[in-house]
């Protein structure tokens, strides 16, 4: 497998030269989050803060690295009409983040209680509160979760 180069800039403005095989387009040095084993029993992987993240910061974009589908494509892929990593911002538009090799957004688990992040209308995952280093990022996907 050929790993892409991180698309971030260094502090002096030069392109980063590190490779990133997972969670493109940035390497682990240039992301605010990391994927690790979730604290939620049976959830598998989860998304965690690598450092403290302030309220209102964008931590991922559900439209980057996801598969965009129309309703027909969604039903073909998910015949039951139910999916766990799909966000639907509008009727007939779906973004599938099931492939964690291309989308870090899909690693954020659903909050069963209080969420500390949300997905805005533009698909950006934004912190609702300040999140301390090491804390799992949880999102209330609302009615678009498990469609």
Features from the language model and the residues they span:
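Residue-level "contact hotspot" at macromolecular interaction interfaces
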Residues: 9, 46, 52, 129-132
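A generic structural signal for residues embedded in beta-strands
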Residues: 8, 61, 137-140
């Amino acid at each position: 497998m050929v790993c892409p180069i991180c698309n971030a800039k260094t502090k002096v403005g030069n392109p980063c030269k590190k490779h990133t095989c997972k969670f493109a387009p940035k390497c682990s040095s240039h992301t605010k989050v990391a994927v690790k084993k979730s604290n939620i029993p049976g959830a598998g992987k989860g998304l965690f803060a690598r450092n403290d993240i302030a309220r209102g910061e964008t931590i991922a974009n559900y439209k980057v690295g996801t598969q965009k589908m129309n309703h027909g494509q969604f039903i073909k892929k998910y015949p039951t009409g139910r999916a766990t990593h799909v966000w639907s911002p509008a009727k007939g538009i779906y973004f599938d983040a099931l492939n964690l090799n291309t989308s870090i957004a899909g690693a954020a688990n659903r909050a069963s209680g209080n969420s500390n992040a949300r997905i805005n209308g533009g698909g950006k995952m934004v912190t609702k509160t300040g999140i301390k280093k090491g804390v799992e990022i949880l999102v209330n996907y609302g009615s678009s979760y498990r469609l």
